Amino acid sequence: MKSKRQTLVILSPGFPKDKADTACLPPQQIFVKALKEICPGLNIIVLAFQYPFFAAEYDWHGIKVISIGGNGRGRIYRLVTWIKAWLILKRLLKERRLIGLLSFWFGECAFVGSRFAKKHHLAHYSWLLGQDARKRNKYFKWIKPKGDELIALSDFVAREVQKNYGVKPLQVIPVGIDISLFKTTSAKRDIDILGAGALIPLKQYDLFIEAIAYLKEDFPNINAVICGKGPEMQSLKLLARAKGVEDNITFKGEVQHKEVLKLMQRSKVFLHPSGYEGFGAVISEALYSGAQVVSFCKPMDKEYRHHFVVKTQGEMNARLLSLLKNRKLDHDPVLICSIEQIAKNMISLFVD
């Protein structure tokens, strides 16, 4: 006999293929695990549309994952993926007691999820996580959502959605961090500047390299580290060589999440040069690691200690120089929000 426990289905473009796949969407991984921990009696099922690149059903930390294996293919293949997702949801509706659907990002998952939920009178929320709030997101035209169906990752994302689409998300639920992942350490802060993220044009790591070149004039032995992979890797390495800082910057490539956190705890400053960011989980993680944070993005209206928001490259360089010259930098952890509280806020939308 099939379980009739309350079931929440999470729809996501991707999800880790196994427990070792910690580099795949770390904030979403942490969130789903937290949901399981605070609601042990709740049955959670994750339906992954595109990644992993294979079709399977498997267990991930006690959570059932159903991978469709869409593999990012477009046109007719994407339609086939949507049909498969719909059929899986129909099966789950028959077998389980669904309390609702939660879609990560306002994209194809939200499209399928919203239509299915309306047809079967289920609660459905779309969690806008950043890029989906920008202009020219076709899914807003297709879905025509109401504000009470939308959850914004940050105050910034909520404003972007209202500005670009004339609808204001009624809920703002930001990134949370799992403080248990941060080990007590007395490690020396031997990394001057750390960066972590996808090496794509939007993240602007060319500005990171130019900042290191600027700082090298005052700190010839400056030690910088960049974690992440992407199509910009080779061009960034060439830029570092051209700027004379190839010996000052270590390109780590893709690094497991727990190792990134360890590097943060060894860093004096975390530099996040991204030109657009819904929130940036790395900002929360770096702050809790005790690093000073410099970024162009300001996700929440509230001010947080150790987070310096700059508007120009010149202002960024000046702030970095000031921080590195300060021999009495405060490296106390700053907590924006715990993942437990975020999970409680989310599940309260589905259950009383």
Predicted regions: what is each one?
Residues 325-352:
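A charged, aromatic-enriched C-terminal amphipathic alpha-helix characteristic of glycosyltransferases
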Residues 9-11, 186-203, 207-212, 225:
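Conserved donor-binding/catalytic core segment of Leloir-type glycosyltransferases
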Residues 1-53, 351:
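N-terminal subdomain of nucleotide-sugar transferases
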Residues 124-151:
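A conserved, positively charged/aromatic
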Residues 156, 176:
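Carbohydrate-associated surface elements
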Residues 237-255:
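Nucleotide-activated donor-binding/catalytic signature segment of Leloir-type glycosyltransferases, i.e.
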Residues 254-255, 262-267:
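Short alpha-helical donor nucleotide-sugar binding micro-motif in glycosyltransferases
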Residues 275:
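Aromatic "clamp/platform" in nucleotide-sugar-dependent glycosyltransferases that forms part
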